[in-house]
Design a protein with these regions (language model features):
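Short S/T/G/P-rich N-terminal loop/turn motif that feeds into the first structured element of a domain
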Residues: 1-52, 59-69, 93-98
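C-terminal structural segments of small proteins and small subunits
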Residues: 65, 74-86
Length: 98
């Protein structure tokens, strides 16, 4: 079973998120995760509330939660919130057989 984390956010210039973007990949990989997709979503139906979406895959719920709760990632969350002025929407979807 695989677990997917969806991160949705409003547009913030990448220059404001330099520290976060330079370091987040290592925190994902250290928990067995990988980035599946990142960018501006294309609306097929409904209203798009976010301008950027990231989709991450982890091999287990424990790895996904371990990544999110890790001190290394939480330090990056603090820098991201400081740069953006608000938190983002992060959701875990589990039990995907691939």
């Amino acid at each position: 079973m695989h677990y997917v984390v969806f991160v949705r956010t409003d547009d913030t210039p990448d220059s404001d998120l330099g520290h976060y973007l330079a370091n987040v990949g290592a925190t994902i990989e250290s928990h067995g995760g990988r980035l599946l997709a990142f960018g501006a979503p294309t609306r097929l139906e409904g209203a798009v509330e976010y301008t950027k979406t990231a989709i991450l895959e982890f091999p287990s719920e424990a790895e996904a939660r371990g990544w999110y709760d890790s001190p290394g990632y939480q330090e990056l969350v603090a820098s991201r919130v400081a740069a953006m002025g608000k938190p983002v929407d992060v959701n875990l979807l589990g039990g995907l057989a691939v």
